[in-house]
Structure formats: C-alpha cells, structure tokens
Design a protein with these regions (language model features):
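Low-complexity Ser/Thr/Gly/Asn-rich repetitive segments
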Residues: 196-198
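Phosphoinositide system proteins, centered on phosphoinositide phosphatases
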Residues: 233-234
C-alpha cells in the first residue's frame, strides 16, 4: 500500500481556490496499489472518474496506470487510464476471445512535470470523453468508439485498481502523487464539477465537488491525510 505524503497542488489561497494538502504516492520499487472488488454491478454504461495526479514526462515504462479495471477470467481483458512518457492513453481490451480492443491516445503531450487534473467520462455505451485540466481531448490517435460495449468498470467481481495492479500484464505505476479521486457511478459529469479556471492566474484549479454521490459503487478518496487510506469519504 502507499503512504500519505503531504503535498500541495498550486497553493494560492488568495484566489479562493480549494487547496489540496495531501496526496498518495505510488512508486514502482514497491509496486503499491489500492484495490476494490464490487460485490454487485453498478452502472456500467455511465460513470465519471476524476482525480489530480503529479506527472513526470520523463517516467519510463510501457504503460503506467492511474486506474485499471480487470477481468480475472482473461489476462488481456482490462480497461484503464494510463500514461507512458509524455502521452496519455485510455485502453479498453474488450474481449480476449475476439481480440477486440479500443485505444485512445492523446496527440497533446505532457511538457512539464507538475499536477494535472484528469477525467474519464463514459456518457453511454457509444460515447466516451477524456479531459485534462478541464479541456476535452479531441485530438486523438488510434481512437475507436466502444461499439456498444459495457465497461469493465462497475462490474461485479472485476477488480478496480488505483496506482498499479496485480494484473497479469504486470503494469505498475510511478506517480509521485495522486489526490482527490472520485468515482461517480451513474453520472456523466463535466470538468466544471471538479475544477475552474482561476481568473488571476489563468490556471486550472481544484474545486470541491458539491453534487450528489449516487450509485452502487460511488466513492471519494481525498488522500489528504485526515482519513484512513482507501476509506470512502463520500
């Protein structure tokens, strides 16, 4: 498991922005991760993932997962948001039996080491959106719609990971920090629900989510050091 390490994401209390005073670190050397296995299906067609993460574009490795949902039945059935070097990916291997898979790769690249806000939003079985710092990523390579398939996320018995996994592919993370993780079951939310553009600095800042925490598997993990790691605060 990781440990809570005090960090600050762009502190600027004078602007009235939410200040995040904690994060959870994941380092490859110890292969840490958080794991949850749903006991029942949530909404597999509509959900929102939102979190802040510290990214180093010089990080090595094929894929470094922020989030991953996996099938225990087939080694190559998994879905998750990850990055390799300076590029963000969302990969969904739908079926090992059929060989079908989906890959979204952003053409925009991480230039600087720093905190970024990420969102993955499944609107329905034919619409999926990626956001970085409030901006939808519409310039994508190898992008394919998910052909009406339900998600690995929110499926009873399929493990949901943060920061790494025990998956057969062996993917592990190297993120110096992750904070303010939300998984909202059954809602396709917008960046404005979690952040805003600061008029004084023209930068994307975190905002406290004030919406509803509906759904079977919804959770909120602040990683602020004020509650046990992995304990849902929704």
């Amino acid at each position: 498991m990781g440990s809570a390490i005090p960090q600050v994401i762009t502190p600027d209390r004078a602007t009235g922005a939410q200040v995040i005073d904690g994060s959870l670190s994941f380092f490859k050397e110890s292969n840490p991760y958080l794991e949850f296995t749903p006991g029942s299906d949530g909404n597999r067609s509509t959900w929102t993932i939102s979190f802040w993460a510290l990214v180093d574009p010089a990080t090595t490795g094929t894929y470094n997962p922020f989030t991953l949902a996996t099938s225990d039945s087939f080694a190559w059935e998994y879905e998750g948001l990850m990055y390799a070097g300076n590029t963000l990916y969302y990969i969904d291997y739908i079926s090992q039996a059929s060989g079908s898979n989906i890959l979204w790769r952003t053409n925009a690249h991480f230039r600087d080491t720093g905190w970024y806000h990420f969102m993955a939003v499944k609107v329905n079985n034919s619409t999926f959106k990626l956001y970085v710092n409030g901006e939808e990523q519409t310039s994508l390579s190898n992008s394919t719609n998910n052909n009406g398939q339900s998600s690995h996320w929110n499926k009873s018995g399929e493990k949901m990971f943060l920061g790494g996994s025990t998956h057969a592919t062996g993917y592990s993370s190297h993120s110096p920090g992750m904070s303010q993780f939300y998984f909202i079951d059954g809602q396709a939310l917008a960046p404005a629900d979690f952040g805003f553009t600061d008029g004084l600095t023209n930068t994307w800042k975190p905002k406290k989510y004030t919406g509803t925490f509906t759904g079977t598997n919804t959770c909120y993990l602040p990683f602020d050091g004020n509650s046990p790691i992995g304990q849902d605060q929704s």
